[in-house]
From Swiss-Prot:
Subunit structure of this chain's protein: Homodimer. Component of the ER-mitochondria encounter structure (ERMES) or MDM complex, composed of mmm1, mdm10, mdm12 and mdm34. A mmm1 homodimer associates with one molecule of mdm12 on each side in a pairwise head-to-tail manner, and the SMP-LTD domains of mmm1 and mdm12 generate a continuous hydrophobic tunnel for phospholipid trafficking.
Segments forming a coiled coil: none
Membrane topology: Single-pass type I membrane protein
Organism taxonomic ancestry: Eukaryota, Fungi, Dikarya, Ascomycota, Taphrinomycotina
Protein name in UniProt: Maintenance of mitochondrial morphology protein 1
Record function comment: Component of the ERMES/MDM complex, which serves as a molecular tether to connect the endoplasmic reticulum (ER) and mitochondria. Components of this complex are involved in the control of mitochondrial shape and protein biogenesis, and function in nonvesicular lipid trafficking between the ER and mitochondria. The mdm12-mmm1 subcomplex functions in the major beta-barrel assembly pathway that is responsible for biogenesis of all outer membrane beta-barrel proteins, and acts in a late step after the SAM complex.
Gene: mmm1
Subcellular location field: Endoplasmic reticulum membrane
Family, similarity comment: Belongs to the MMM1 family.
Length: 295
């Protein structure tokens, strides 16, 4: 009797998602990022053209070019309606859930943040910084109203612009000390406890591709926020050992300004963040073909 192999619902679900991701990636890599020069080189290496079939190949390329639909026939950026992105929200929620589990399992986020705070840029008037607790939140961002628009600085490029809303409680608690270095180093220390919370982030997010070139062989997925973003930050402070001062406005203002400046200089237009897209296009060296010598 032949026993058939049956997948569970969970296994089938993840295999299906993986298949979709692979298909989308292959489509982006080979159809969007394959330049005419790369395509021509591959055709020349795989199928060298002889004088007898050059004419037929040219006619075939011309015919193919005529029947290839333009982008406006597939997606008209001027008339297409905004998309809800419900499917995208589900994928982002699954990825974010896994990131949170990994960060909690081995305290990766806590260790990374503590190393960052105690780096070379730490002011001399602050003692060692200890992260008492950290939370990456429990809710998920909601993306909506996606629109495909032309790049403002590139006539051929497109970008996806969408609304982002995150209502959550992302926070960390820090214990440190204010150090008085006069009249001598570490003359006196004042304990300081801080609680920093990010309660909401709202704004417009733009995502676009940077195509690879000869100088930069990798392609990148870029994302940036519009300058009119809204970030809700709550700061609580406790200063002193015996007589404690609570929620000093000046401390809250300094920390909030630092956080906003850090975000603006990295993630707000014209600044952007990049995610490198792996190059899976096989090179002639990896395939074992003979490299052509340049004369």
């Amino acid at each position: 009797m032949v026993q058939l192999f049956h997948l569970t619902f969970t296994q089938g679900f993840f295999i299906g998602q993986l298949s979709v991701i692979v298909i989308v990636y292959i489509f982006l890599r080979f159809f969007l990022f394959c330049t005419k020069e790369e395509l021509k080189n591959v055709q020349e290496e795989s199928y060298p053209l002889s004088p007898s079939n050059e004419k037929s190949t040219t006619e075939f390329n011309d015919a193919t070019h005529k029947v290839t639909p333009s982008l406006s026939e597939i997606y008209d950026v001027k008339t297409h309606e905004e998309e809800s992105l419900d499917w995208f929200n589900v994928l982002v929620a699954q990825a974010l859930s896994q990131i949170r589990q990994d960060a909690v399992s081995d305290d990766a986020a806590l260790k990374k943040l503590q190393t960052l705070f105690n780096g070379k840029r730490k002011p001399s008037f602050l003692g060692p910084i200890h992260i008492k607790s950290i939370s990456l939140g429990q809710r998920y961002p909601v993306f909506s109203n996606c629109r495909i628009q032309a790049q403002p600085d590139d006539t051929n490029g497109l970008r996806a612009t969408m609304d982002l809303s995150l209502e959550d409680d992302i926070h960390f608690v820090v214990n440190t000390s204010a150090v008085l270095n006069v009249p001598r180093p570490a003359f006196a220390m004042l304990p300081v406890s801080l609680s920093v919370r990010i309660v909401h982030i709202r704004g417009k997010l733009s995502i676009y591709f940077s195509q690879s070139s000869k100088s930069a062989k990798r392609a990148y997925l870029n994302f940036t926020f519009d300058p009119d973003f809204d970030m809700g930050i709550e700061i609580q402070s406790l200063v002193g050992s015996r007589s404690k001062l609570q929620d000093i406005p000046k401390i809250a203002h300094i920390i909030e300004t630092r956080i906003r400046k850090w975000f603006i200089t990295r993630c707000v237009s014209p600044q952007f963040q990049q995610i490198s897209i792996p190059n899976i296009w096989p090179s002639s060296a990896r395939e074992g073909h003979r490299q052509k010598s340049t004369e």
